[in-house]
């Protein structure tokens, strides 16, 4: 969830879904 950046780093949130975060998409 993009609402918990403090709990899980955006780049460590999901190895395969880290790209979605940088792009700004929440399709993961």
Curated annotation (Swiss-Prot):
Keyword Lipid biosynthesis tagged: no
Which superkingdom?
Eukaryota
Q: Which cysteines are joined by disulfide bonds?
A: 17-28
* Keyword terms: Cleavage on pair of basic residues, Disulfide bond, Hormone, Secreted
Give the subcellular location.
Secreted
Q: Which GO terms describe its cellular component?
A: extracellular region
Report the InterPro entries cross-referenced here: Somatostatin/Cortistatin_C
What molecular function does GO assign, one term? hormone activity
Its family remark reads:
Belongs to the somatostatin family.
Q: What does this protein do?
A: Somatostatin inhibits the release of somatotropin.
Know the name of this protein? Somatostatin-2
Give the originating organism.
Answer: Oreochromis niloticus
Q: Which gene encodes it?
A: sst2
